[in-house]
UniProtKB/Swiss-Prot annotation:
Matches recorded under Gene3D superfamilies: CRIB domain
Keyword Cell membrane recorded: yes
Predominant place of localization: cytoplasm
Sequence ranges of Basic and acidic residues compositional bias: 63-72
PANTHER family: CDC42 SMALL EFFECTOR PROTEIN 1, CDC42 SMALL EFFECTOR PROTEIN HOMOLOG
Protein name: CDC42 small effector protein 1
Lipid-linked residues (S-palmitoyl cysteine): C10, C11
Domain notes: The CRIB domain mediates interaction with CDC42.
Membrane topology type: Lipid-anchor
Superkingdom assignment: Eukaryota
Lineage of the species this protein comes from: Eukaryota, Metazoa, Chordata, Craniata, Vertebrata
Family: Belongs to the CDC42SE/SPEC family.
Protein's job: Probably involved in the organization of the actin cytoskeleton by acting downstream of CDC42, inducing actin filament assembly. Alters CDC42-induced cell shape changes. In activated T-cells, may play a role in CDC42-mediated F-actin accumulation at the immunological synapse. May play a role in early contractile events in phagocytosis in macrophages.
Self-association state and partner proteins as the record states: Interacts with CDC42 (in GTP-bound form). Interacts weakly with RAC1 and not at all with RHOA.
Amino acid sequence: MSEFWHKLGCCVVEKPQPKKRRRRIDRTMIGEPMNFVHLTHIGSGEMGAGDGLAMTGAVQEQMRSKGNRDRPWSNSRAL
């Protein structure tokens, strides 16, 4: 009888869940931008060492004034 329970125990073992594979994205799945609006251009010299942080605030202010966005720009991330 113990042989029966041993064999039954081998069949009842919990099987690990299969890992979900992430779908790979290729370029055919990506379309053109829908609501792209070019607000400003920042050159590498404009974000220089001296006034880089002050310039960042000015750019954010300019971006805020460009359009009535539903989502306000976040200032929570420090540079």
